[in-house]
Amino acid sequence: MTGPTRETELAHLDRPKAPETTFAVVSDAHVTADAEGTWKVFHRTESRLEAVVDDVNRRDVDGLVFAGDLTKDGTSPEFDRVAEILSGLDAPYFAVPGNHDVPKTFDEHETPPLSTFVAAHCPDELPYRARLGGLDVVCLNSASDADGTLREGHAGRISDAQLDWMADAVDPETPTVAVFHHPTTHVGRLFERFPDTDHYQLQNADAVVEALDSANVELAISGHIHWPTAARVSGVSGESDSRPRNGPADSFDGVTQVTTPAACSFPQAYLLVRVTPEGTTVSLVPLGDDEARTEAYRYAAADSARDSAVAESTDDGYFDSFPLLDERAPKPTTSD
């Protein structure tokens, strides 16, 4: 097992460019006090979120963004525990909901309505725009919809109304990052070891990428798949370009999609995003020690085909291949 043991650069991006701004992105904490085991390592979820707070408090960050799934199942006690842990955070934070944070038809408990999540973790009604240092962050809801269709499962979709709102809300003169839970890319098509499961990717990925590109949003950050990726997205569903990995993005029209590793499951990490006038660096920050990392790896390896893919990809040297994207690398020389 070779997982990340220290802060590791996931991507060097040509854009966004902005006055120096640093923020953390955390996803899929799945906090619970009442469950153990599984590939999500439920009995460690509280301590992993506490580790996020401790680590971020030691850094000079402009803020922290949660990309969804703060809780295991969206129960009131789970939300209360999240709030208790986050009360120790020094930096400002805001969040978008994940599929486990919102009511589902199959819940065996009463999940608080979305308005409760918004009141606790958002500066305004969803969707909203927040300022972090020298850039704007547009936060969209991919986990629930007005007609209730997403209540039937774990799929994600960003409504047309939100995309229309974004078109008006984004300031074209201000570098902008978008955050939503379900990604536009499909991990099963980026990496063959992962199964081709429908709910891994936004149902309307094409429309979302087109809207992001039209609004001049150059970077989208999501969670949901519990695995760190970085890819250039063209707007054709499933056609995401993470190869070639290195080289300038001068001729690339589209959006860069980054997915955030889970705080709960292997590799138990979060992202640190540093934006400068020269470009953006996205780094993976591990949360646990060697013992914690080994435990999470063993749970992943022993679980379903999807999670054994995590272990197999790690064994194949996935983390040794970082950065996955390096858009600021010099162009390769060619011989005449």
Spans of features found by a protein language model:
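N-terminal active-site segment of His-dependent metallophosphoesterases
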Residues: 1-79
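Extended active-site neighborhood of metal-dependent phosphoesterases/phosphodiesterases
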Residues: 3-15, 76-172, 211-213, 237-239, ...
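A short C-terminal boundary segment appended to hydrolase-like catalytic domains
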Residues: 3-8, 18-19, 277-336
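Active-site-proximal beta-strand elements of phosphoester/diester hydrolases
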Residues: 21-34, 134-148, 177-181, 254-264, ...
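Acidic/histidine-rich helix-loop elements
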Residues: 24-47, 102-121, 145-158, 188-197, ...
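Divalent metal-coordination and catalytic microenvironments
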Residues: 28, 64, 69, 82, ...
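Active-site environment of divalent metal-dependent phosphoester hydrolases
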Residues: 32-33, 72-77, 97-109, 142-150, ...
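His/acidic metal-ligating clusters that form di-metal
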Residues: 51-63, 150-256, 308-333
